[in-house]
Amino acid sequence: MSKTAKNTKTIKSVKSVNKDNKPNKDNKDDKNVDEEVINWLDKYKPTSSSQILGDKNNINRIKAFLSQFTKENAEINCPNLILTGNNGVGKTLMTDLIIQEKGFEKITADLTNISVARKSKKKKKVEKEYNGSNRTIKTYYTTLYNKSVSPTGDLIEKKIVVVFDDVSNISNNKEKEAIKSIIKINSKEKKIPIIIIANMKHSKTVNELKKMVTVTVKNTNSQGRKENKRTSNEIIIKAPNPDEIREFIAYICRKENLKLKQRKSDDDDIYEEIIQHSQFDIRRLIYILESLKMIHGNNDVTLDEFDAYREISKTKDIDPGIYKATGTLLNDYEGISGALSLYEEERATIPLMVHENYPSNIKHQYPKMSVEDQISVIHKISESISESDKIDGLIYSNQCWSLQPVHGFYSCVLPSYFINMHPNKLRMSEIYKYTQDYNKTSIKKINNKVIKKAQENQHLKRVSIYDFLYMASILKTLLERKDFEAVATLMKPYGLKLKEIESIIKIDKIKKMKNTLTGKQKTQLKELLGVDE
């Protein structure tokens, strides 16, 4: 429960008790206070899509998506749709109203008893049929489709829409895989409209779904040729503009006799301040207006009264996303508490994002800074990140979770301070790279596995990692020259298969081969090496 709601309940309890700490019998409205508070949200909740605040084009796009599944229109371009937007912008409400208006029935998928197909060692999909209530993805999908089809094969008047809500916060891997499997089947079968709802929080699952939920767009290039381009079928729901919200506030004030008074001496606009405090969240906005009415009744609410209310009403925490958080840390130092709050959003990833992107930020945002000064800043930040790495090791090796703020201080706060303390920073928009650390960890394990496998060969038991790197470098050079006989002469005495030689070549990640080996070249090498594979 938000602090605003808690404050409202506190106000209600104070109003219903007199000085003698007894119920106030004279106040006839006390009995209905709870009902009135609840009805504030119900009273101003849109009953049709035309009443929804925000971009009407998004509403039309969702309606057009559902219209594909009517009897008259059999052609379905894309059966899946993904809606993204910040919390509180009305994604779910908008979806529910449009589904109702278009004559569909909303189905919230229950994925608890669904078994997901897995790949065996032979890379063949094996789908286990479980006894009891467990169902396969295909069985579940068929069940959904049968709900919208009559025994004669005609579409039932009450069609269904499957909605996966709040996908960004799903933590169960089984459910994630089930959703992806259902989307994959529906992309092929195109029998059921599926809507995915997610927030703007960084999520690997959501990113994967965006790549799966695609639509074909027909274009004509500059030469007059037709081209089919696949793009993500995503609708980004943005918050209403301030003018719309201002009109909505004025409407509620008229209906509830809430007197917001703007004085000539006020430096700021009270409407604008309320909008900013609501953070463009309409649900939160209604709670704020409700609280002001409960506190001040029919009295005027000036900017001073609102400032006093704002002091005790905490703003909601907004997840800025890892890229926006990285940009804020690198280009705008917000103090210790501000930087730590960004760190708290994604403790593992954001420090790595800072580490990945701070050198390029210094280079591009300080063009007038000398190379020596740039190196000095990099040195300070790298020392701080190095300290954070030591603390990170202590946290996970000794379970010292209380040290996480210290880790955040060295990994985010100090780097943000050092990188923003110098004058004349451009602060231009940048495209940040996703951290390569996770990939490097995976590569390290793969390389260790390859080296251990190669060292099983009696000729390579005592070969060090440096020797393998030299081997990889020499082999790459020879292969790029297409000198296959030289490769065979060097490697034949070791008795290695071509696959093992290719694995050794891949150990060197610094210098990549310009061209991979073709099938004919691999066959030629196998013959020269005297191996089958």
Swiss-Prot record:
<comment type="similarity">
    <text>Belongs to the activator 1 large subunit family.</text>
</comment>
<dbReference type="GO" id="GO:0003677">
    <property type="term" value="F:DNA binding"/>
</dbReference>
<feature type="region of interest" description="Disordered">
    <location>
        <begin position="1"/>
        <end position="31"/>
    </location>
</feature>
<dbReference type="InterPro" id="IPR008921">
    <property type="entry name" value="DNA_pol3_clamp-load_cplx_C"/>
</dbReference>
<dbReference type="InterPro" id="IPR013725">
    <property type="entry name" value="DNA_replication_fac_RFC1_C"/>
</dbReference>
<dbReference type="InterPro" id="IPR027417">
    <property type="entry name" value="P-loop_NTPase"/>
</dbReference>
<feature type="compositionally biased region" description="Polar residues">
    <location>
        <begin position="1"/>
        <end position="11"/>
    </location>
</feature>
<dbReference type="Pfam" id="PF08519">
    <property type="entry name" value="RFC1"/>
</dbReference>
<keyword id="KW-0235">DNA replication</keyword>
<dbReference type="GO" id="GO:0003689">
    <property type="term" value="F:DNA clamp loader activity"/>
</dbReference>
<dbReference type="GO" id="GO:0006260">
    <property type="term" value="P:DNA replication"/>
</dbReference>
<feature type="compositionally biased region" description="Basic and acidic residues">
    <location>
        <begin position="17"/>
        <end position="31"/>
    </location>
</feature>
<comment type="function">
    <text>Part of the RFC clamp loader complex which loads the PCNA sliding clamp onto DNA.</text>
</comment>
<protein>
    <recommendedName>
        <fullName>Putative replication factor C large subunit</fullName>
    </recommendedName>
</protein>
<dbReference type="GO" id="GO:0005524">
    <property type="term" value="F:ATP binding"/>
</dbReference>
